[in-house]
Design a protein with these regions (language model features):
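Short aromatic/hydrophobic contact patches that present stacked aromatics
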Residues: 25-29
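A structural signal for alpha-helix termini and helix-coil/disorder junctions
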Residues: 6, 45, 109, 141, ...
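A glycine-rich, hydrophobic loop/mini-helix early in the fold
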Residues: 1-24
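Long beta-strand-rich cores associated with HINT superfamily self-processing modules
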Residues: 17, 30-139
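Intrinsically disordered, low-complexity acidic/polar and Pro/Ser/Thr-rich regulatory regions
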Residues: 135-156
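Surface-exposed peri-terminal alpha-helical interaction modules
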Residues: 7, 23, 33-36, 74-77, ...
Length: 156
């Protein structure tokens, strides 16, 4: 309802279906960054899934440091007497991205935090996001070395 009020729209089924893209959503947490894109590709290859919008916050992180791949897709939902399209938000991220986003949300949106302090801590939060991204890349590199059989000597 907040989103409808903010957009000054009536509280009707039509207004919701036409203007609210995240009435339904799912978060997919993957082990590795490359898995995110593989999962997205598999989803979008389904003949009953239509891509409406794609926001790649992995390749283009938010200023806060937030990383995730967001897809708005349209999928069929089956009601008692009909099949209707529904917009669904799909968020795909790694375990590290999910860890950071969960903790950042808890810290940033706590009540009674001084705005000035929060602004100063934002630099630390972005630094943590960057370190988290480095960890993702390092773990993916290790996985690829294992897959190629190059786990010998000083390869690490």
């Amino acid at each position: 309802m907040k989103k409808l009020r903010k957009k000054e729209l009536p509280f009707t089924t039509d207004a919701i279906e036409e203007n609210i893209t995240d009435i339904a959503g799912i978060r997919v947490v993957c082990s590795f960054e490359e898995d995110i894109y593989k999962m997205a590709d598999c989803l979008l290859q389904q003949d009953d899934v239509t891509l409406i919008e794609r926001k790649d916050y992995i390749k283009h992180p938010k200023e806060s440091g937030y990383r995730s791949l967001h897809l708005i897709v349209e999928v069929p939902i089956f009601l008692e007497n009909e099949k209707r399209p529904m917009k669904v938000e799909v968020q795909l991220r790694t375990i590290a991205m999910d860890f950071w986003a969960s903790l950042e949300h808890k810290l940033r949106y706590k009540k009674n935090i001084d705005a000035e302090l929060l602004e100063k801590l934002s630099v630390d939060l972005v630094d943590c996001a960057n370190k988290s991204a480095e960890l993702d890349k390092k773990m993916e590199s290790i996985k690829k070395k294992i897959e190629r059989g190059k786990v010998i000597g000083d390869d690490f």
